[in-house]
Amino acid sequence: MNPDNEDSIHDFLQSQITDTPLSLNNELSNRGVKFNHRDDFEEIRTFIDEFIDGNNVNRYIVLPGLRGVGKTTILFQVYDYLLNQKNIRHEQILYFSCEELNKIEDCDIYDTIKYYLKTFHNSSLQTLDEKLFLLIDESHFDKDWSLSGKIITDKSKNIFAIITGSSAINLEYNAEAARRMIRYPITPLNYSQHLKLKYNYHTDISNDLIDLLFNG
């Protein structure tokens, strides 16, 4: 990290720590109606619960997917779950978008997290003694995202990281990092999933069609 940028990265991180909890309602609802969870969220929540319970194996989750399929919403739902259901302090959860981080010259994911630990937790990757959750959006703006994620989660067993990015990140990850990460592609909703999310209507379309074809 360029030392001249420390004030900028400090202000950026302080804003993320302070403002993200206040933005949850706007990010997770429309006209007062809270968004339902995708099935993908339920899978990710399992890894989170295991980590909180002391299992530190599956801590590096990567969510590739097309723009607009709901990756950012999942990250905010994870934040909300940690804060309001698991009683994790907001100081232990960091959300940021690499698209915004990219506006700070010579600043990447790895340097940002090192600065975050040093400045806001008086710690380092090697000495961190509390559980932290990193929710990193739009990782494709950092060409070294996969290696950074690997190093961060390798050096600290107390960090749980979820990283999202465009579908292209499927082709960009470091070979060594690929052995450590869990890739969970976020795909466009099918019709059943759309009904569940938008109208809270649960149905198995395939079974309904079979029943209609054979039973009229």
Say what each PLM segment does:
Residues 57-76:
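Walker A/P-loop nucleotide-binding motif
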Residues 166, 171-216:
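Interdomain motor-coupling "hinge/lid" segment immediately C-terminal to the ATP-binding subdomain
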